[in-house]
Amino acid sequence: MKVTNAEYMASAYLSSQFPSEMYPEISFIGRSNVGKSSLINTLINRKNLAYTSKQPGKTRTINFFLINKSLYFVDLPGYGFAKVSKTMQKDWEQLVNAYLSQRNTLKLSILIIDGRHGPKDADIDMFDYLLDFERPVLLVATKMDKVKANKRKQRITEMRSALELDQDDELITFSSATGEGKNELWQIIEDLL
């Protein structure tokens, strides 16, 4: 898809702040600092539309970005960051649950995993949780440019095994630095719209 327009639309601390359901939505979810915002920025050919930070836990709201005035990219707060209060973690969980359970226009949830390290227990739990909603889930392994070429096949096999993926289940390898996986990811998104 050629992105001709991408704009920030809203940040929601509460489900009542979600924009109206006018367009199909693609959600992006993953642990803190796995590269969610960088992935979004790479897909839309912008450097700073989705805020990136080296400090984990910066995305504390659900952020909606309107793409080509026809599609929302939805950046969900990162999970698994221990340096926030239990109350804040619970608030994030409730907000994300409200989003995932209420949005009729949600077409795909993209679960982002750090390809350098593979899935952590929290990633496996999130994958199972997303599957409970009976909507499409796509796995994307980011930062693959940092995995040595002679270790990539082994890393992908390990990720597929840890997540108990079937042969037909897709796992996209992605790099914001090189653009690897960008076209493949866009093709999957376009096929769902």
UniProtKB/Swiss-Prot annotation:
Chain positions recorded as GTP binding sites: 30-37, 57-61, 75-78, 142-145, 174-176
One annotated GO biological process: division septum assembly
Record InterPro entries: G_ENGB_dom (IPR030393), GTP-bd (IPR006073), GTP-bd_ribosome_bio_YsxC (IPR019987), P-loop_NTPase (IPR027417)
Cofactor: Mg(2+)
One GO MF term attached to the UniProt entry: metal ion binding
Name of a matching Pfam family: MMR_HSR1
UniProt binding sites for Mg(2+): S37, T59
Keywords: Cell cycle, Cell division, GTP-binding, Magnesium, Metal-binding, Nucleotide-binding, Septation
Residue ranges of every copy of the EngB-type G domain listed in the record: 22-193
PROSITE patterns registered for this protein in UniProt: G_ENGB (PS51706)
Annotated family: Belongs to the TRAFAC class TrmE-Era-EngA-EngB-Septin-like GTPase superfamily. EngB GTPase family.
Purpose: Necessary for normal cell division and for the maintenance of normal septation.
Cross-referenced PANTHER family: ENGB-TYPE G DOMAIN-CONTAINING PROTEIN (PTHR11649:SF13), MSS1/TRME-RELATED GTP-BINDING PROTEIN (PTHR11649)
Xref: NCBIfam families: GTPase_YsxC
Name assigned to this protein: Probable GTP-binding protein EngB
